[in-house]
Amino acid sequence: MALRFIGIDPDTDEHNCPRVWVDDEKKELVFQGWKAGKELEDEVRSTGPLPDYEAVVRIPARMVHILREACDAIEHPDVVR
């Protein structure tokens, strides 16, 4: 698997921070974010199950432009950025 790095939280010190990648082979977005606490996980479970093989992470709103870029990259892989 070859991940294509898209971006990092712009307010970061480059360590231990939210990041976004695209897996072009599997056509998936990959996120590193802050782990959800029990309270947030419980709120998520109120709309459906949270299986053991899934995780809830937080991504700051200031990364919206990076998320859009990742969506565009996976939807249009032929366009070089």
Which residues does each predicted region cover?
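N-terminal nucleophile
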Residues: 2, 13-14, 80-81
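A broad, low-specificity signal marking well-ordered, structured residues that form hydrophobic/aromatic
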Residues: 4, 29, 57
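Short Gly/Pro-enriched turn/cap motifs at secondary-structure boundaries
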Residues: 8-12
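A short, structured beta-strand/loop element
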Residues: 14-54
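Helix-rich interaction surfaces within compact, conserved domain-sized segments
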Residues: 43-81
